[in-house]
Every structure is written in C-alpha cells, then in structure tokens.
Amino acid sequence: DAGMEAAVRLLLNRPESTISRSDVWGLNTLTITERTMFEGDSGTTTIVTVTAQQGDATLEQEISAVGKESPLPALASLHDLQYFDSLQAFSYSTSPTANQAFTDFSGIETMSHLERFSVNGARPETLEPLSHLSQLKQLSLTECGTLDLTPLEGLDQLESLILSSNDRIVSLEPVTKLPALRSLSLSSGTAVPSLEPLAQTHLAVLDLGLGVGQSGLYKEIDYSPLSQLPDLVCLNLTNHTRVTTKFCKQILAHSPDLRFLNIQNTPASEGSALDVEYLRA
C-alpha cells in the first residue's frame, strides 16, 4: 500500500532505499495521524505524524504541506501490517475530513496478537477482518460512517469499545456476545436503534454523551435499559433532553456501584434534588 509505505519510510527516515521485514519487526506500536489545521490568514496546513514504540524507545517523524492535500498518499490497505511481527497496537486517524478510500480492513486478520486497534475517519464496508483478532482488548472506530458490529461477536478479550462520532450503529445486539466488555462509548452523535441489548451486558463505563443539538437522535429511544446495569460505575448522559430526575433515581437505585453520573444540560440537572451525595465519596 502506497500510504503505508510512505508512512513507514517517513518514520524510518528511509526515502528511497529498500525496507525489509527486519526494519519493522521489532515495532510494538504504530500510530499514523493526519490533521488539517485552519490558521486564518496564515492559510491551511496538513500535517502527518508517524509514531512508533520499540521497547523503551519512541520513534516519531512529522511532515507537513500547505493546503488541504496530504503530503503523503492516503492509506487504503492494512496488508503491509503482516510484516510487523511484534505489533501490539495500531492507530490511524485523519481529521477533519474522512479518508473515503480507506474502506477495506483486510490484512489485519493476520495480526492475531494485536491488542489495541484504533481507526478514525475511515469508511469500512465490513468489520469481518477484525473477527480474527482474538487477543484484542481495546477497539476504537470513530467517524467511520455506518457500522455493523456483528463480526465482533466472540471477541472474548475485548474490554473497551469506542464507537463515538459515527453516523449509525446497525444494532447493539452484538455487544451482548462480548463477555469481557466493561467500557462502551457511543458519544458525540452515534445513532442507535435501541438501548435494550445493553441490559444484557456487564458494563462499568457507558458514555452516551451528546453534543449540543444532537438530542433528537434519542427522540424515540427507550431509556429504561439504563436502569438495568447493576455493574455501572460511570454514566454520561450529557445533553439528553428526556432524562428526568425520576429516571436518574431509578438508575441510582439499580446501580449501587455508580460513582459518576453526568447529567449536564438535561432536565434532571435543572434545579432538581437528586440524592447523589454518596457519589462524591
């Protein structure tokens, strides 16, 4: 893949000479970040940063270009990761514009030892390649359009799942097949058809925080499953305009371990008398 090759060449400061497997096999983490900065009268600059961890050493290189065009080819494939024999974590992010060419996660299935996988700003057609990552503990897919989580069923080691800022999740039913899952984020405007499957989970952390003006996404949603999460420790309901004091009391009654409840900009936060003193302990 031209995008992956360019990123690795930048990281290794190897613009032309041959790159062999031995050059990358010892890398434990690889992070590729592309961001466009709007600087007013100074114009627009696009910056790509590539970072890697190799044992206790950190490698980092950066390249920039004037304008919205990336100084490196866009990432379109993960097949080259098969050469990173020691890789435990991979992260790719592009903002504020999504990489429309990054639609295929094929190639990642060879990385059965991967523990952390994070992608922001792609448009994956399917998550099936991720189903082979049996050691995956943390998964983040943000600004990735519409996602069908079905292929994630059976990832027995997955503890944290971040699905913020997506257009839509087809169904939350697959999260009930993730026995180790303790943290789930659906914040910043990710639409879901129902919260009912969450009642079958053992979540400790649930982030449903919305941005200003996004409350309409939950206009028809039944909130009652949130009062059926006995293991809950942290819950974010920011900007949910249908969350009342009465409902918050139901949550507190059924979640004895709850220590943090964010109800900013909800009816429950407007002069209500929630009995939440013990949450501050």
Model-derived regions: residue spans:
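Short, structural beta-strand-to-alpha-helix junction motif
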Residues: 20-21, 25
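Concave beta-strand-loop units of leucine-rich repeat
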Residues: 28-107, 113-129, 135-151, 157-174, ...
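Surface-exposed cap/linker segments adjacent to membranes
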Residues: 1-19, 34
